[in-house]
From Swiss-Prot:
InterPro entries: NA-bd_OB-fold, Ribosomal_uS12, Ribosomal_uS12_bac
SUPFAM superfamilies registered for this protein in UniProt: Nucleic acid-binding proteins (SSF50249)
Similarity comment: family membership: Belongs to the universal ribosomal protein uS12 family.
Keyword Ribonucleoprotein: yes
Modified residues (3-methylthioaspartic acid): D89
Any single Gene Ontology cellular-component annotation: small ribosomal subunit
Pfam families in UniProt: Ribosom_S12_S23
One example GO MF annotation: structural constituent of ribosome
UniProt keyword list: Methylation, Ribonucleoprotein, Ribosomal protein, RNA-binding, rRNA-binding, tRNA-binding
Disulphide bridges, residue numbers: none
Source taxon at top rank: Bacteria
Organism: Ralstonia nicotianae (strain ATCC BAA-1114 / GMI1000)
Protein name: Small ribosomal subunit protein uS12
Entry-linked NCBIfam families: rpsL_bact
Length: 125
């Protein structure tokens, strides 16, 4: 327990919060260009080929971001929008690419949770 005098000389300093998505620099989303589109495998108990892309952002950061949904039309030099949100079983992947925005199309024939995958409302039969 410090004395009052010690606190007057050197006050308590609150710990600074560290961002979980530093490349966004407090913005909700950021635009970037794909430098590499590839698949990678998840951590131990899971098994799959997860689609990811290395993206060079407008602020100069280069990040790995996840492409959600079934199928995509991304290739090198595609312009994409990224948002925060990590993928728990892919180390180093701390961002998601927004579906249905800029060069990335929405998921085809998606019926539920459409807004998360940039899919338009299907025509009523």
């Amino acid at each position: 327990m410090p004395t009052i005098n010690q606190l007057v000389r050197k006050p308590r300093v609150s710990e600074k919060l560290k961002s979980k998505s530093p490349a966004l620099e407090n913005c909700p989303q950021r635009r970037g260009v794909c430098t590499r589109v590839y698949t990678t495998t998840p951590k131990k108990p899971n098994s799959a080929l997860r689609k990811v892309a290395k993206v060079r952002l407008t602020n100069g950061f280069e990040v790995i971001s996840y492409i959600g949904g079934e199928g995509h039309n991304l290739q090198e030099h595609s312009v994409v929008l990224i948002r925060g949100g990590r993928v728990k079983d892919l180390p180093g992947v701390r961002y998601h690419i927004v579906r249905g925005s800029l060069d990335l199309q929405g998921v085809k024939d998606r019926k539920q949770a459409r807004s998360k995958y940039g899919a338009k409302r299907p025509k009523a039969a």
